[in-house]
Design a protein with these regions (language model features):
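Active-site loop/helix belt of alpha/beta enzymes
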Residues: 1-83, 90-91
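C-terminal accessory subdomain/extension
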Residues: 89-203
């Protein structure tokens, strides 16, 4: 597999890999009476090295609607959503969550969501490091992400209990979360636990 296909600084190395693969595979082909299928491109390679697609390609993360290069050219296919479980008014200077990590600097409306790190919501997203979307507006996480619940600030958002919340999806790309976590989208996706209900749609 072309290991540096997602980074332009490795293009010379990648082209060298492709040339070596082509030479070796042609040598093998001469030893077989039938055509052998050749493939070397991963998701990034499909986008950046179309001339190296040979007979097949290995669409990995691209299959899940994530591009290693440019998300504008691929449709999102995976969304993680939850709903607002409860909304409470919390006074200024009070705290939210375990270890009293969520310090409030104003009178706030705090919403509880029934999703936590046991579902795959990374704890490093808490304490204002990230946000989710409520009715299309950014709602930052307040305090620590708990095992089964997390809290968000909806003070400036028109919302009610039962409203949908997008953790990642069409309007909040998973790459936003992976960038905040300094990881890759694969890790975010594979961290979603089995207890999270999956719903599949067919177009």
């Amino acid at each position: 597999e072309i290991v540096g296909s997602d980074a332009a600084q490795f293009d010379a190395f990648t082209r060298g890999q492709i040339e070596m693969f082509e030479a070796a595979s042609m040598q093998l082909q001469e030893a077989f009476p039938h055509k052998i299928l050749r493939h070397i491109c991963n998701s990034a390679g499909i986008e950046r090295f179309p001339g190296a697609q040979f007979d097949m390609v290995r669409l990995g993360i691209g299959l899940y609607g994530v591009s290693p290069i440019d998300n504008s050219i691929i449709n999102n296919v995976s969304t993680l959503k939850t709903t607002i479980l409860q909304i409470r008014d919390v006074p200024q200077e009070d705290t939210v969550g375990y270890s009293r990590k969520g310090h409030l600097t104003r009178n706030s409306r705090i919403a509880a969501l029934p999703i936590g790190y046991a579902d795959g919501l990374n704890r490093h997203l808490g304490n204002g490091h990230a946000y989710c979307l409520v009715n299309g507006q950014r709602a930052p996480y307040v305090g620590n992400i708990c095992m089964d619940v997390c809290m968000i600030d909806v003070t400036d958002i028109d919302c009610k209990e039962g409203d949908a919340v997008e953790i990642f999806g069409d309007h909040l790309p998973i790459t936003v979360l992976s960038d905040i976590l300094e990881t890759i989208p694969y890790e975010v996706l594979t961290s979603i636990s089995t207890r999270v209900k999956r719903i599949y749609y067919q177009d």
